[in-house]
A protein has these predicted regions:
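An internal, D/E-rich "acidic patch" concept
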Residues: 71-128
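Short, small-residue-biased leader/transition segments that mark boundaries at the very start
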Residues: 2-9
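Cytoplasmic-entry segments and transmembrane alpha-helices of multi-pass inner-membrane transporters
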Residues: 17-26, 132-168
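Alpha-helical transmembrane segments of integral membrane proteins
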Residues: 17, 107, 111-144, 160, ...
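Hydrophobic membrane-targeting alpha-helices
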Residues: 36, 40, 44, 135, ...
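Hydrophobic alpha-helical transmembrane segments of membrane transport/permease proteins
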Residues: 31-81, 171, 175-188
Length: 328
């Protein structure tokens, strides 16, 4: 038995490594296509996106500047040079946002605050959304389910920008905080974190409730009831645990989407994170910064998808990597 168990573990590890190799290979190809496409599209933008004082420059100065940056070279040469530099950690320099500042350095300063806010928002959404979905699934068609459904419908029916503005309008007065974000004061984190977590609260509650309802109709639940197991034990020890398996798959990607999708909230609260940086760079036509941000966001999204698949398979041993791969 021990030998058989060791062989199963070894086979599972081999399947996992094969699966990871395939997913990473596909992810690299996807990343290459996305970033290269954005790179080409940005080359169609006006050239003022590469100069801070474009309006004061002569045509000769503009052409000399473009030549020094290699923007007059054939497009395949530019793409090849970009990827070679990127592999060495060089994403170029910003010409508008901060003149001659390293794109990599700017991203390294802006990303931590967005990740920190995303972590807080994700934890809050899990703390609220999971118990909410649990009660809705446990008391299906009763008052906890009806109240939870009404809350979910309200969150999903109202445009996000509307309740963002209401949270800011009434929250700043209630907490006595200004509109300029202060990372050293916990009160300034409350409103943006609550705003970012609302959508995920509805998502987790709705899907956990659905998965629990599906699980409650399966044979193992009927068997547990026939053995006299209490409804609370069935709900917590059996239905809830199995219902969480498919939901866990979405947690990494939901977290990373929260970080990436915080553009409006960071701009609304003047948070010096990635969202505000992207808006500013797009408005100022800082093409070098924009392509660096797109590269980072693409990497973040791909990592989230891979982590979600791995979590789902690792948590539930019944799911094999071969089946997971075949299902795609």
């Amino acid at each position: 038995r021990l030998v058989g168990s060791e062989m199963c573990i070894r086979d599972r590890r081999t399947d996992m490594l094969k699966y990871l190799a395939k997913r990473i290979g596909r992810s690299i190809l996807t990343l290459f296509i996305i970033v290269t496409l954005v790179f080409c599209l940005l080359r169609l933008m006006p050239v003022e996106g590469y100069f801070a004082n474009y309006e004061k420059m002569t045509e000769a100065q503009i052409q000399a500047g473009l030549q020094s940056m290699g923007l007059l070279d054939p497009l395949p040469v530019q793409i090849g040079r970009f990827w070679v530099n990127m592999l060495h950690g060089d994403l170029g320099v910003s010409h508008i946002y901060k003149v001659n500042a390293s794109v990599t350095g700017i991203l390294a300063k802006k990303l931590p605050i967005s990740i920190q806010m995303g972590v807080y928002a994700m934890l809050l959404s899990l703390v609220i959304g999971i118990p909410m979905g649990l009660f809705m699934g446990r008391f299906k068609s009763r008052w906890p389910d009806k109240i939870g459904t009404a809350i979910i419908v309200l969150i999903q029916a109202v445009p996000a920008a509307v309740y963002y503005l209401y949270i800011q309008m009434y929250g700043t007065t209630a907490l006595n905080v200004g509109l300029l974000f202060d990372a050293s004061n916990w009160k300034y984190w409350v409103l943006p974190v609550c705003s970012m977590s609302l959508g995920n609260v509805a998502f987790y509650a709705m899907w956990l409730r659905r998965y629990m309802v599906d699980e409650s109709n399966k044979d193992y639940v009927r068997l547990a009831r026939a053995k006299g197991v209490s409804e609370n034990n069935i709900a917590l020890r059996h239905i809830f645990r199995n219902a969480m398996v498919p939901l866990v798959q979405y947690i990494p990607s939901a977290f990373l989407n929260t970080v990436v999708g915080s553009i409006y909230i960071e701009s609304l609260y003047s948070i010096p994170g990635m969202g505000g940086l992207l808006v500013t760079c797009v408005q100022r036509h800082d093409n070098t910064m924009v392509q660096g941000i797109v590269l980072l966001y693409a990497c973040v999204g791909i990592i989230g998808l891979i982590l979600g698949d791995l979590l789902m398979v690792l948590i539930d041993p019944r799911i094999s990597f071969g089946k997971k791969e075949g299902g795609r």
